[in-house]
Amino acid sequence: MASELAMSNSDLPTSPLAMEYVNDFDLMKFEVKKEPVETDRIISQCGRLIAGGSLSSTPMSTPCSSVPPSPSFSAPSPGSGSEQKAHLEDYYWMTGYPQQLNPEALGFSPEDAVEALISNSHQLQGGFDGYARGAQQLAAAAGAGAGASLGGSGEEMGPAAAVVSAVIAAAAAQSGAGPHYHHHHHHAAGHHHHPTAGAPGAAGSAAASAGGAGGAGGGGPASAGGGGGGGGGGGGGGAAGAGGALHPHHAAGGLHFDDRFSDEQLVTMSVRELNRQLRGVSKEEVIRLKQKRRTLKNRGYAQSCRFKRVQQRHVLESEKNQLLQQVDHLKQEISRLVRERDAYKEKYEKLVSSGFRENGSSSDNPSSPEFFM
């Protein structure tokens, strides 16, 4: 792998910014694919067509669309030594980019291609912050030292590469999800859950500056069109990032009404009044408050029932004690009456046995023992 990546010093750019851009990527992750002679010819044709300003976002599988261009070395213009840089286009630098470039399918201008790619950017599976940063550095180096830092001309950062870099930066600013493909940065999407309006706008401006630098370095109608497309892509990314910063569930208010309504207010408030107070509140918050109100009502009903049961039990116990006292009193009365009855019966038996009756007793005296009862 190292022997295949080895290149002569004349082919490598001597700018420190370009070398830093190359060092930002883990080159061991990229696949090196050697194509036959026909594939090299097709690649050169695709490079010339892309440099002419015709881009397409259709995912069709064609010989031209199967080999994407290089980020830092676009198709060279005629007479710029294409034999020395032809093997550089064999490196697949966009391994995670799902959109295929097919210049022969539709006759899109660079502006139309940028808009089409941005509109379909939700299909991307990861961000390309490293690519955008490297493209910005290369574009700045190409604009500052035209001919000194990148081999003597701005052709190293061609218009097609500038347009593609601007599209990638805009897509990364708009999607804002997925892991970053730096060699040492592997952040989850949740770490960037609270975006600000300034960061996506900065990414969009960086993409616009990269596109403008590519257009200035190329020189000619096609280069000017590529620069304009890159600037448009950057602006779109900045606008999308600024809009994405205002996510609905990150509102500063919080929409939590626990402090606004006390438990007593939730229980005593009527349903109509509660619905009037909850106008404009999210559905989840309304459901949560109504469930809390129902729980408080059930809890209050259970406490009321428990209190009533305890109170009724106390009343019944007091009545039971009173009834037991009355029963005891009645038992005492019964026992007293039984004793009196026994005493009278014994007295009667004594009188009968002593010969109470006499022979000449008058009829006024009772003759039946029941009289003494």
Swiss-Prot record:
Ubiquitinated, leading to its degradation by the proteasome. Ubiquitination is triggered by glucocorticoids. Phosphorylated by GSK3 and MAPK13 on serine and threonine residues. The phosphorylation status can serve to either stimulate or inhibit transcription. GO terms for biological process: in utero embryonic development; inner ear development; integrated stress response signaling; lens fiber cell differentiation; megakaryocyte differentiation; negative regulation of transcription by RNA polymerase II; positive regulation of gene expression; regulation of chondrocyte differentiation. This is Transcription factor Maf. Belongs to the bZIP family. Maf subfamily. Residues 126-373 are annotated as: Represses ARE-mediated transcription. Expressed in endothelial cells. The gene is MAF. One of its GO terms (molecular function) is DNA-binding transcription activator activity, RNA polymerase II-specific.
